[in-house]
């Protein structure tokens, strides 16, 4: 029986292990962590005949190399173990690549980008489902891709949100339609340079049969046309903004408050409920994918009327004494947080901080000076953020450390300063205090609802 190892016991790792085991592999799952939660998650695998090694790692000195290694998205692609495995001829892939090997006969929409991926993916899936298609979302959202393999349904399309980590470990994944939402510095601690990060993202679009790019993104606008001369482009700034990118009849754009897709009027933009120009950009990309997949205007318009957003992305939680509390926990870098704050209509109390990332904070700081009447700082980044705010002449900040303190103080300051909203938009990863941005957002939700 051939040997396979899965590294990482998350949702992706569990699904990958089951796919391999189903197809006759002798599977061992490794995870360096060992706790009650992981043991509980792994127990069904053990009962199914899959080996589980917690608090341990694959050691080829103690045991022979397996024929195959599948890694979860959180495992760096260049760790010495995986480099050595590839040199030994071991097949090393990510979980998404494993799923692609089973599901490549189904057309995929692959969505990548620094920011905007999840909302765009959710919009694409919503439109496709409104059109009556069996089009599940997977990857960085929804199902682990290998869960779709196990369900073994007759899929019309697969809609995949694909991170740079997943692209890196999926060398043959080739969507029918590839969408690139935005590009700004992120994940540099993993990818080392901006060029590496860009090239990883670009490789997915290069393998896609049809490319769609956001023409409002400066980096894509500058570098995309040479890479993808046949690409379709989108813009919230009118047909003229597509000049030099594509024929407007081959793009999707806003003109006079109407969505125009491939030369056809689709719907007035005021039907769309989500705030912010960035969400309009996400919508245009989703409409481009839908029209390229042959979906009619009716399904698109009906989705515009009913789609209200996704959790942790400018998600309204509640209103207390006229102050709206908004969860933008997904804003894990400066650019996403700057976009979130810019979408606020009135004076805002901002909650920021967490595990800081590399990046240019200038536009974010400028937006704070323009929109935030006070900033409440949490997590490990709080002292550094305080220093940065002070350096640009912004003094109305407080280090409050925890989410509960921030929410309580936010309500007090909002009342005192006539602010219309308290916005959690951290500009940071969450791993100093939480396991994920979702967990951070749920803590914010619980703290807010505790004040109602």
UniProtKB/Swiss-Prot annotation:
GO terms for biological process: cell division; cell wall organization; peptidoglycan biosynthetic process; regulation of cell shape. It catalyses: UDP-N-acetyl-alpha-D-muramoyl-L-alanine + D-glutamate + ATP = UDP-N-acetyl-alpha-D-muramoyl-L-alanyl-D-glutamate + ADP + phosphate + H(+). It is an enzyme of class 6 (ligase). The keyword Amino-acid biosynthesis does not apply. Gene3D superfamilies: Mur ligase, C-terminal domain, Mur-like, catalytic domain, NAD(P)-binding Rossmann-like Domain. One of its GO terms (molecular function) is UDP-N-acetylmuramoylalanine-D-glutamate ligase activity. It comes from the Bacteria. It is found in: Cytoplasm. InterPro entries: Mur-like_cat_sf, Mur_ligase_C, Mur_ligase_C_dom_sf, Mur_ligase_cen, MurD. SUPFAM superfamilies: MurCD N-terminal domain, MurD-like peptide ligases, catalytic domain, MurD-like peptide ligases, peptide-binding domain. Keywords: ATP-binding, Cell cycle, Cell division, Cell shape, Cell wall biogenesis/degradation, Cytoplasm, Ligase, Nucleotide-binding, Peptidoglycan synthesis. ATP binds at residues 113-119. The keyword ATP-binding applies. Its EC number is 6.3.2.9. One of its GO terms (cellular component) is cytoplasm. Its main location: cytoplasm. Pathway: Cell wall biogenesis; peptidoglycan biosynthesis. PANTHER family: UDP-N-ACETYLMURAMOYLALANINE--D-GLUTAMATE LIGASE. NCBIfam families: murD. Belongs to the MurCDEF family. Cell wall formation. Catalyzes the addition of glutamate to the nucleotide precursor UDP-N-acetylmuramoyl-L-alanine (UMA). HAMAP family: MurD (MF_00639). This is UDP-N-acetylmuramoylalanine--D-glutamate ligase.
């Amino acid at each position: 029986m051939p040997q396979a190892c899965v590294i990482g016991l998350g949702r992706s790792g569990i699904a990958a292990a089951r796919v391999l085991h189903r197809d006759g592999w002798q599977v061992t799952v490794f995870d360096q962590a060992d706790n009650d939660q992981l043991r509980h998650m792994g127990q069904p695998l053990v009962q199914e005949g899959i080996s589980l090694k917690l608090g341990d790692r694959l050691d080829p000195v103690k045991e022979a190399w397996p024929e195959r290694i599948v890694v979860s998205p959180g495992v760096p692609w260049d760790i010495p173990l995986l480099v050595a495995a590839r040199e030994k001829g071991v097949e090393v892939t990510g979980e998404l690549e494993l799923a692609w090997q089973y599901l490549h006969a189904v057309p995929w929409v692959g969505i990548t980008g620094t920011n905007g991926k999840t909302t765009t993916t959710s919009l694409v899936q919503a439109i496709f489902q409104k059109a009556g298609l069996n089009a599940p979302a997977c990857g960085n959202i929804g199902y682990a891709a290998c869960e779709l393999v196990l369900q073994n349904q007759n899929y019309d399309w697969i809609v995949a949100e694909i991170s740079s980590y997943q692209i890196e470990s999926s060398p043959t994944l080739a969507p029918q339609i590839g969408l690139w939402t935005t590009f700004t510095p992120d994940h540099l601690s993993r990818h080392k340079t901006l060029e590496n990060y860009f090239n990883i993202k670009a490789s997915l679009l290069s393998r896609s049969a049809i490319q769609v790019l956001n023409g409002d993104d400066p980096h894509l606008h500058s570098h995309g046309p040479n890479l993808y001369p046949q690409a379709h482009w989108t813009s919230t700034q009118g047909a003229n903004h597509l000049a030099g990118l594509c024929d407007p009849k081959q793009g999707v754009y806003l003109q006079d408050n109407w969505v125009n897709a491939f030369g056809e009027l689709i719907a007035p933009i005021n039907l769309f409920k989500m705030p912010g120009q960035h969400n309009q950009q996400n919508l245009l990309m989703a409409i481009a994918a839908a029209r390229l997949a042959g979906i009619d205007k009716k399904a698109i318009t009906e989705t515009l009327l009913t789609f209200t957003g996704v959790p942790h992305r400018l998600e309204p939680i509640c209103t207390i004494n006229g102050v709206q509390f908004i969860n933008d926990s997904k804003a894990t870098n400066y650019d996403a947080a700057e976009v979130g704050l810019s979408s606020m209509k009135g004076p805002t109390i901002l909650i920021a901080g967490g595990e800081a990332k590399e990046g240019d904070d200038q536009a974010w700081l400028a937006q704070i000076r323009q929109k935030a009447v006070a900033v409440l700082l949490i997590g490990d980044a709080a002292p550094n953020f305080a220093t940065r705010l002070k350096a640009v002449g912004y003094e109305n900040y407080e280090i409050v450390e925890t989410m509960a303190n921030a929410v309580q103080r936010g309500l007090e300051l909002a009342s005192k300063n006539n602010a219309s909203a308290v916005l959690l938009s951290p500009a940071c990863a969450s791993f100093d205090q939480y396991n994920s941005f979702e967990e951070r957002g749920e803590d914010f939700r619980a703290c807010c609802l505790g004040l109602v």
